[in-house]
């Protein structure tokens, strides 16, 4: 399983935004939409072994978590508006601390970074930062990872502190600073290559076959 | 310089589509929009050393080429709707075989794959196909490349014939078939790493500094 967390510092936490203006009205929700698409799509299908966790910290109710589960996901197309629409539907739900299913494979609840980190106890955490250790030296060791990425604002000092306390390792994907969705594509590629080398089938094909 | 060609087999060739429905009304223009964004954006700025060539083959006037020049580009944001809007503006121009500037850094003309290939004479062409040679064995040799990618329909037999006749080398970016925009991110990363190893500054920073 690959879990990917993206922190949206300004991303709206109510569904009253316009799908025609995801960058403006929805607090740079376009960034999160592109991350969802990069995390989940293969050329002909979905990555079944991936969960995406969007941590939304914008107004009016900072601290909501939307989870996309590749294994159960439906109604998602690769365009930004499609993931934006599923996010909007999830934000129209009345949420509590407990998971509520919005659409197939999409879940929403209240929570913050600590909530998420607690749910990953025992997993290996990797926090993406441009000066981190190059993933190319590590990719053969990485199993069952959780990756944590910031948005256009990066990761705050407070968040970084929480990540390091939780044992996250700092990694990078190349020599220059890239958008989060591009980083996700690069992470997947490293792991796909490592899985293929081990004779496994990348992208969770086995899971799909067993559905 | 890195030139990237994406063939949009169904992409509309008039500007009368809705930015609210890039996949449907504009003939999977969403794919081309994501490619533009992946090709041109760095975390804090634009890749100045990249040109993107969209070959639009959909109705009503199949055979238009829109070129985005990283060095001169303005008004582009990373969201799909932003590149969709610049494409739409270009398609609203009356075009001929000669380049017409639509907005800063965006040019449009009539043409087909052969027109494009002729304009790259002397350059090294790389055609992306999932069973191609792995770029990781080649990346240190690649200078001044032109990459050619298909859309959701891939590349037709006829196009492939033209590409091979023009001397294109078939390469791949990993063990599984990916969306074109993800392939572009992976191509850039390989070249960025090779440039960094050679002590160059990836992303065309030198060009930017000299503007």
Swiss-Prot record, chains A, B:
Localisation:
Cytoplasm
Q: Which UniProt keywords apply?
A: Cytoplasm, Methyltransferase, S-adenosyl-L-methionine, Transferase, tRNA processing
Q: Does the record bear Zinc-finger in its keywords? A: no
**InterPro entries (UniProt xref):** Alpha/beta_knot_MTases, TrmY, tRNA_m1G_MTases_N
Q: Which GO terms describe its biological process?
A: tRNA methylation
- Enzyme Commission number(s): 2.1.1.257
Specify the superkingdom: Archaea
Subunit field text: Homodimer.
Q: Spell out the family assignment given in the record's similarity comment.
A: Belongs to the methyltransferase superfamily. TrmY family.
The UniProt function text for this chain reads: Specifically catalyzes the N1-methylation of pseudouridine at position 54 (Psi54) in tRNAs.
* HAMAP family attached to this UniProt entry: tRNA_methyltr_TrmY (MF_00587)
Q: What is this protein called?
A: tRNA (pseudouridine(54)-N(1))-methyltransferase
Identify the species of origin. Methanosarcina acetivorans (strain ATCC 35395 / DSM 2834 / JCM 12185 / C2A)
Encoded by which gene? trmY
């Amino acid at each position: 399983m690959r879990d990917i967390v993206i922190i949206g510092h300004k991303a709206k936490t109510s569904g009253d935004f316009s799908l025609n203006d995801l960058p403006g009205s929805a607090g740079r929700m376009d960034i999160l939409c592109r991350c969802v698409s990069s995390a989940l799509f293969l050329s002909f299908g979905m990555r079944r072994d991936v969960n995406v966790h969007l941590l939304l910290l914008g107004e009016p109710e900072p601290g909501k978590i939307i989870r996309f589960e590749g294994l159960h996901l439906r109604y998602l197309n690769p365009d930004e508006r499609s993931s934006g629409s599923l996010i909007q539907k999830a934000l129209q739900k009345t949420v509590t601390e407990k998971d509520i299913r919005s659409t197939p494979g999409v879940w929403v609840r209240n929570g913050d970074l600590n909530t998420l980190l607690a749910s990953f106890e025992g997993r290996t955490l990797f926090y993406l930062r441009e000066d981190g250790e190059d993933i190319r030296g590590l990719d053969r060791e990485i199993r069952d990872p959780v990756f944590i990425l910031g948005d256009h604002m990066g990761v705050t000092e407070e968040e970084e502190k929480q990540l390091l306390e939780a044992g996250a390792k700092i990694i990078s994907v190349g020599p220059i600073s890239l958008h989060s969705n591009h980083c996700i594509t690069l992470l997947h590629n490293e792991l796909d290559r490592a899985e293929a080398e081990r004779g496994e089938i990348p992208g969770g094909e086995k899971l799909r076959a067993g559905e």
